[in-house]
């Protein structure tokens, strides 16, 4: 449980000498459901001197980054509480405006591509319309606003056949249906340009010798 016994005791004013007769069960329930993690509560008096409290807590689905703030969210997108420690570090990270409301639905769409989903370190919402995937090796996959299954299928095929997600790639742009753009990392781009220049120089030299 994320809600501590101390929080419950303090909120209900229980100090070991509180009279059960004086305890208002309905008022106690209303107070407890105001705690950030509490979804529902069952509370009853067990005479002569016991109060039984059963809490149903909200379930954290992910971490939502909005600006500089980090919050824990439910599947519905509702904010539970600010992120305070590392115990939830394994939860998926969603970034940007409206990312929290579309998080669960979007992740569900990736269920058929676990080899991609398992490599995602952050789901970034762009302009409230589409998503970028930030992978564990720094590659950014820019997904389209529509036709998401087709884009993911293409990405999976490119990785299977060309190992595109294991190369010196900075970004894979799948936003357009008629073309895929692959942006190399700065180092890879420089090496490629050096190779092109060398080949061009060699061709010119060969032409002079003929």
Curated annotation (Swiss-Prot):
This protein's record includes keyword Lipid biosynthesis: no
GO biological process, one term: cell septum assembly
Function: Essential cell division protein.
PANTHER family with a match to the protein in the record: CELL DIVISION PROTEIN FTSQ
Family membership: Belongs to the FtsQ/DivIB family. FtsQ subfamily.
This protein's GO CC annotations: plasma membrane
Entry-linked PROSITE patterns: POTRA (PS51779)
Gene name linked to the record: ftsQ
Keywords (A to Z) from UniProt: Cell cycle, Cell division, Cell inner membrane, Cell membrane, Membrane, Transmembrane, Transmembrane helix
Listed Pfam families: FtsQ_DivIB_C, POTRA_1
Species annotation: Rhizobium radiobacter (Agrobacterium tumefaciens)
Domain POTRA: 1-58
Membrane topology qualifier: Single-pass type II membrane protein
Main subcellular location: membrane
Transmembrane regions listed in the UniProt entry: 8-25
Compartments where located: Cell inner membrane
Top-level taxonomic group: Bacteria
Name of the protein in question: Cell division protein FtsQ
UniProt-listed InterPro entries: Cell_div_FtsQ/DivIB_C (IPR005548), FtsQ (IPR026579), FtsQ_C_sf (IPR045335), POTRA (IPR034746), POTRA_FtsQ_type (IPR013685)
């Amino acid at each position: 449980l994320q809600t501590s016994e101390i929080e419950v005791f303090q909120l209900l004013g229980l100090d070991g000498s509180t009279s059960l007769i004086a305890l208002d069960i309905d008022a106690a329930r209303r107070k407890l459901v105001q705690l950030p993690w509490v979804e529902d509560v069952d509370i009853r008096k067990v005479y002569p001197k016991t109060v039984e409290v059963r809490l149903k807590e909200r379930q954290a689905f992910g971490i939502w980054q909005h600006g500089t703030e980090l919050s824990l969210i439910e599947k519905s997108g509702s904010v539970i509480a600010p992120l305070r420690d590392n115990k939830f570090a394994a939860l998926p990270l969603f970034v940007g405006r409206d990312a929290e409301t579309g998080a669960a639905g979007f992740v569900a769409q990736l269920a058929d591509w676990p080899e991609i989903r398992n490599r995602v370190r952050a789901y970034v919402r762009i302009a409230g319309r589409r998503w970028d995937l930030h992978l564990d090796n720094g590659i950014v996959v820019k997904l389209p606003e529509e036709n998401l299954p087709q884009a993911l299928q293409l990405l999976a095929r490119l990785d299977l056949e060309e190992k595109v997600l294991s190369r010196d790639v900075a970004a894979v742009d799948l936003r357009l249906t008629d073309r895929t753009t692959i942006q190399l990392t700065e180092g890879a781009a420089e090496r490629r340009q050096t190779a092109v220049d060398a080949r061009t120089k060699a061709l010119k030299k060969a032409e002079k010798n003929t």
